[in-house]
Curated annotation (Swiss-Prot):
Upper lineage: Eukaryota, Fungi, Dikarya, Ascomycota, Pezizomycotina
Induction notes from the record: Expression is induced in response to 2-benzoxazolinone (BOA) exposure.
Organism: Gibberella moniliformis (strain M3125 / FGSC 7600)
Protein name in UniProt: Transmembrane transporter FVEG_08292
Membrane association type: Multi-pass membrane protein
Region (Disordered) residue spans: 1-24
Length: 471
């Protein structure tokens, strides 16, 4: 049975069985076997993808969200102030965790859905599924490009700009693609542990280093200086929206959790993994970014490691680069896995070691790695890439689409009890917040990138100049 047929039948059956907000997925629970509708089957004659425990899923969710955003968040907080930034960060983190639960619950009620595109196909049909699929790929390429650009900065810093920055960007893209080419999330999960540890240690070393400095590395070495710390700042619309987008996108990776659920031993354990990951990542972002801002003030670099001075910048990059590469590799892996399943679904090649299987998988990874490299060289500034990703894709994926899916399954709440109608209204409001983020952030990021080219902050595309401040 093809995915189009399954989604069509699911849509018809779900509509018939929805009664005042109560949900019966497909036909009655006594007749439906959710396990048989899972994307990856279990059996002796196929490659077993269903090997991820909830503990390993938790670490993967943490690494998906706790990544290069920590290198942009302190700058974002310095723009909107410590109190303002903390409120925005906590608010968006809470909202993103909630919508992540919505996505996971919806996926477990409709297990034939591998990615968000399949889910949106239930309510928008084939056209909607294909459009959202393109968005998924665009989002992952933009974030991967941000990681490639940041890794190139790190290689520049470690080598004192011994090579053209484009060469370092190419090397970064190759390393990320090698990581993303690991075939299953279970095997990728083992190196994710290593990546999470090294990246966290690198960030901790950097954070401790800035607390031991007499003054920020970028400040004047002698005389008085203004730290620039403020509780609530008043930035302009463009700067404020770019900063808010960076604070939003740092925990908006919930759409990337979905393919992991398809490879979990027990998809029912998703909620547990999601909540633990949200708590851990939210606390790490809040505490570390506030400490960094307290000691660096407005004297912050993007990426933030440049604020620690030449020695600790190198130490921090040296420790955290493996984690950065692995984390970005997961983003590219998700995009590649979506395209891979999309092309080979319902064929023997999906779970068998055939030439078509391997050729498709490696070819997709190579294509996406190449695209990320080109984007990274065209817009080589992390916070702009993250802001652009947040505007075009992350806001719909984390705010708009989850609420539409919730309203699809709980359609009866619109005319139900007072509490049910209130719940329905809340989800409409969350979707409207998402629409505002899309429009406002897209405008702000485009203006900011235009200003960066005009001011020389971005000199030209495929630029060999040092971008790490090392020379």
């Amino acid at each position: 049975m093809t995915i189009e047929t399954m989604l069509s039948e699911e849509k018809s059956q779900s509509s018939d069985n929805r009664n005042n907000g109560s949900i019966k997925v497909g036909i009655s629970s006594g007749e439906v076997d959710l396990e048989s509708r899972e994307v990856f089957r279990t059996g002796d004659d196929v490659l077993d993808f269903r090997t991820v425990s909830w503990q390993r899923a938790t670490i993967m969710f943490c690494k998906i969200n706790f990544a290069m955003s920590i290198l942009a968040i302190p700058q974002a907080i310095s723009t909107v102030g410590a109190v303002g930034g903390s409120l925005i960060l906590v608010g968006f983190t809470s909202l993103n965790v909630y919508t992540a639960l919505i996505l996971g619950d919806f996926r477990n009620r409709h297990p034939e859905c591998h990615m968000l595109a399949d889910m949106m196909g239930l309510i928008w049909g084939m056209v909607g599924r294909e459009l959202v699929g393109v968005q998924i790929i665009v989002l992952q390429i933009l974030i991967t490009a941000g990681g490639v650009a940041t890794t190139a900065v790190g290689l520049n810093a470690l080598s004192n700009h011994s090579q053209c920055t484009v060469i370092f960007g190419l090397a970064s893209a190759i390393l990320v693609t090698a990581c993303s080419s690991v075939r299953t999330f279970s095997k990728l999960g083992w190196i994710t542990w290593f990546g999470m540890i090294t990246f966290t240690v690198g960030v901790l070393v950097f954070t401790i280093a800035v607390t031991q400095q007499d003054r920020p590395a970028a400040a004047s070495p002698t005389g008085d200086f203004d730290l620039g710390w403020t509780a609530i700042a008043n930035p302009g619309f463009v700067v404020g929206m770019v900063s808010s987008a960076n604070l939003f996108i740092c925990t908006s990776g919930s759409s990337m959790f979905l393919p992991v659920i398809s490879e979990m031993r027990r998809p029912q354990d998703y909620r547990k993994a999601c909540l633990w990951a949200g708590l851990i990542v939210g606390m790490l972002y809040l505490v570390l970014s506030l400490v960094i801002y307290r000691y660096c003030g407005t004297w912050l670099s993007v990426p933030a490691f440049g604020s620690a001075g030449p020695l600790f910048k190198k130490i921090s990059y040296g420790i955290s680069l493996p984690g950065l590469i692995i984390g970005v590799g997961i983003y590219q892996h998700v995009a590649a896995k979506y395209a891979f399943v999309r092309l080979l679904r319902d064929s023997d090649h999906l779970q068998k070691n055939t030439f078509t299987h391997w050729g498709t998988w490696l070819g997709i990874n190579f294509a996406f790695g190449t695209a990320a490299f080109i984007v990274a060289e065209a817009v080589p500034i992390l916070n702009y890439l993250l802001g652009l990703a947040g505007a075009l894709c992350a806001a719909p994926f984390s705010l708009i689409f989850p609420c539409l899916l919730w309203m699809y399954d709980f359609k009866g709440y619109r005319s139900g009890t007072l509490i049910q109608r209130a719940q329905y209204t809340i989800h409409v409001l969350i979707a409207l917040i998402g629409l505002y983020m899309v429009a406002g952030t897209a405008y702000a990021v485009v203006v900011a990138i235009k200003m960066a080219f005009q001011s020389g902050t971005i000199a030209r595309v495929f630029d060999c100049a040092d971008n790490s401040g090392s020379v």
